[in-house]
A protein has these predicted regions:
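Acidic, metal-coordinating catalytic segment for phosphate/diphosphate chemistry
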Residues: 2-25, 30, 87-90
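Short secondary-structure capping micro-motifs at structural edges
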Residues: 13, 62, 97-101
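Short secondary-structure boundary/capping segments
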Residues: 17, 25, 100-104, 122-124
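Short connector loops at helix/strand junctions that flank enzyme active sites
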Residues: 20, 28, 46, 68, ...
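Residues embedded in well-ordered beta-strands
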Residues: 24-26, 32-34, 111-113
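Conserved Nudix-box catalytic region and its N-terminal flanking loop in Nudix hydrolases
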Residues: 32-74, 79-83
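Nudix hydrolase/Nudix homology domain
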Residues: 39-44, 105-111, 115-174
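Active-site segment of metal-dependent pyrophosphate-handling enzymes
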Residues: 70-118
Length: 174
């Protein structure tokens, strides 16, 4: 591993020099989305994290929801009805994006919608200042303000999960 990769890995859990894969989980309940105020990034974000080499995106989403929010969640989306030896279908992310982290590093984000199944919301104090459920109206009042992209995903998740459907068909649980 070169020195740049090593320093990125030790500070931000990056496992690749230029691009890492991440998961964001927009957990919705009663018309509100669960957000964390991230200590290191100083931003309001959904639950989420990096996909490690031995994990698939669903595993990461479930793990991060528990670690960062104290919740067991059900992922919402479509799982293809594929079968066969050596094949396991995954719920497709609702959206994908790529966002710049630094001049030399980007994240490909897999964006999931979810509902809580079990657990009590809890703050991961080492990583976050705050955790809270926010309505669409409350998104505008958060300090520091969230990015327009995160706000858009929040609004879309609240609307689609509350309505119980998304383009392309009904949401199905994991």
């Amino acid at each position: 591993m070169n020195p740049v990769s090593k320093s990125l890995t030790s500070t931000m859990a990056h496992i690749h020099e230029k691009i890492d894969f991440t998961v964001a989980i927009f957990v919705v309940q009663n018309g509100k989305v669960l957000l964390i105020h991230h200590r290191k990034l100083e931003k309001w974000l959904p639950l989420g994290g990096h996909i490690e080499l031995d994990e698939d995106p669903e595993q990461v989403a479930l793990r991060e929801a528990k670690e960062e929010g104290g919740l067991e969640v059900e992922l919402l989306g479509e799982r293809p009805p594929t079968t066969g030896a050596g094949t396991r279908a995954l719920i497709a992310p609702r959206f994908l994006d790529i966002h710049r982290i630094s001049d030399s590093h980007e994240h490909i984000g897999m964006i999931y919608w979810a509902r809580p199944k079990n657990g009590t919301v809890s703050l991961a104090r080492a990583e976050h200042y705050d955790i809270r459920w926010c309505s669409i109206d409350e998104l505008e009042k958060l300090e520091p303000p969230m990015t327009e992209a995160v706000k858009w995903y929040c609004q879309r998740a609240i609307k689609e999960v509350t309505d119980g459907a998304c383009p392309g068909g009904q949401l199905t649980s994991s």
